């Protein structure tokens, strides 16, 4: 089953969040990007557990734009291995989904 729309999650340093969110919307790679300013992340990196304050971007977009969105974000993202993951939208408000189509 193919899904037309997806939600993309991107973690980033807090000071980079707005720049990346603006890039996504300005390039019409996402209809909307929400910024959750501060999350606590705990993860494995280079053999040890790390803890950081990060921001979480939540992007609503079309699935066919994901690869382009990923490549554009990787160009400006400061992390060596940025989290850029997509989850399908399996159902939603039809008016909102239409707005995604019209906005990106």
Q: What name fits each language-model region?
A:
Residues 1-104:
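Positively charged, small/polar-rich N-terminal and surface patches that mediate targeting and assembly
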């Amino acid at each position: 089953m193919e899904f037309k729309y997806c939600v993309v999650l991107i973690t980033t340093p807090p000071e980079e969040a707005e720049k990346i969110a603006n890039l996504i919307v300005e390039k019409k790679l996402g209809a909307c990007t929400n910024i959750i300013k501060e999350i606590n992340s705990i993860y494995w990196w280079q053999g040890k557990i790390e803890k950081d304050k990060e921001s979480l971007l939540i992007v609503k977009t079309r699935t066919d734009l994901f690869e382009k969105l990923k490549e554009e974000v990787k160009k400006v993202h400061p992390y060596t291995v940025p989290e850029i993951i997509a989850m399908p939208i399996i159902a939603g408000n039809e008016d909102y989904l239409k707005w995604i189509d019209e906005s990106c």
